[in-house]
A protein has these predicted regions:
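Bacterial N-terminal signal peptides that target proteins for export
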Residues: 1-9
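Short intrinsically disordered, low-complexity segments
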Residues: 12-13, 43
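Hydrophobic h-region of N-terminal signal peptides that target proteins for export
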Residues: 13-20
Length: 355
């Protein structure tokens, strides 16, 4: 009896010691310095995140004790993230082809959800590519392999699919970029292999297409991501190494970029976004940077370089800018999202304090 009690005491002490064992400090890289811009503007690095473990509340003592005995629970982490968008609730929604699903990070309510192929056995997601949201925070996901657009409600519940690979109306070869015009009730989709932009109604019927293969104005060579901004539809024309801007009816307005090996040109344009001052952000996947242009096509500044430290990227892809000018960049091969903050004129004083 005494021997059994001693053994039990030793086991308990080992468990308690493990529960309170000081953890080795995680290696933290120093944040890059703020980028001081013209007119008192400023770009700051905020943080990065990569898994559900960074959203949910920290586990208490008894939960950690159970983890030691039963093993730590599995947490969803990014595998090969590609596209990102934020909704009106401040949630960050990330497509992850490597995980065959979509991550929803809700930092305000400390919640996380993963949308996967198992959510709809009959018509599963295969390779989720790009994500968009509408005014009601419904989530739209293009699937480049299935040739469809998957629609979920704001809670993440599957609603329906749009399009197919089988021909007929809504026939896609490789749907990639997507944007939703909530006011006009329109959905815009790039079909990368057909070099076209589809304009759909909210039920998925095709209203219009525009574009063809070529290098001229309004022509495409491997179009990928797109964004709506005001009256503009902005399209990444990847293999023409540029970004083209149209009105919402598909009429060409202007283009930015061109192939080259110097700043202001593009080699692998990926994600795009527009800040509150109307400047255009373009991710270059090969160079591992984000370039920022004005509407005249002039390069204003850039940030990032190739690497694994904070503020560095390994094959970055998607980009999204929220209403507070926080910039979310998909750092794909580093398996994380990096967050920056642009402080425009009037949002930051020359003394360095908030106004």
């Amino acid at each position: 009896m005494c021997k059994s009690l001693k053994i039990a005491t030793v086991v308990l002490m080992v468990i308690l010691a493990a529960a309170f064992k000081p953890t080795k400090p995680a290696t933290r890289t120093e944040a890059p310095p703020d980028l001081q811009l013209e007119g008192g503007r400023r770009l700051s690095y905020e943080r990065s995140f990569s898994s559900e473990n960074e959203v949910k509340p920290k586990r208490g003592f008894w939960s950690r004790l159970v983890d030691i005995v039963a093993g730590e629970p599995d947490f969803h982490s990014m595998v090969r993230p590609y596209s990102v968008v934020t909704d009106s609730r401040g949630r960050v929604i990330v497509s992850d082809p490597g995980a065959a699903g979509v991550h929803i990070f809700d930092f305000a309510d400390k919640k996380y959800k993963f949308l996967s192929r198992a959510d709809n056995i009959k018509d599963p997601m295969l390779t989720p590519q790009c994500v968009a949201v509408d005014a009601s925070d419904n989530i739209y996901v293009t699937d480049s392999e299935a040739g469809k657009i998957f629609v979920f409600d704001a809670s993440g519940k599957y609603q329906r699919v749009i399009g197919s690979l089988k021909g007929g109306e809504g026939y896609f070869k490789r749907p990639t970029g997507i944007a939703v015009d909530a006011k006009a009730q329109r959905i815009y989709v790039t079909d990368t292999l057909r070099d076209k932009i589809f304009m759909l109604d909210m039920q998925g019927s095709v209203l219009q297409t525009f574009g063809k293969n070529g290098q001229g104005e309004g022509e495409f060579n491997y179009p990928t991501e797109l964004r709506l901004d005001g009256d503009n539809l902005i399209v990444v024309d990847a293999m023409n190494f540029r970004v083209q801007v149209f009105d919402r009816s598909g009429q060409f307005r202007f283009a930015i970029g061109g192939i080259g090996d110097s700043t202001g040109t593009m080699f692998r344009p990926k994600g795009i976004g527009v800040d509150s001052e109307g400047d255009l952000y373009v991710v270059d996947g090969l160079w591992g940077m984000v370039q920022v242009f004005n509407r005249q096509g002039d390069l204003l500044y850039y940030f990032g370089s190739r690497g694994t430290e904070a503020g560095e990227f390994q094959l970055p892809t998607g980009l999204s800018i929220d209403a507070q000018d926080r910039i979310f960049v998909v750092d794909s091969f580093n398996r994380r999202i990096q967050v920056f903050h642009f402080y425009g004129a009037g949002k930051w004083s020359h003394a360095g304090g908030s106004q």
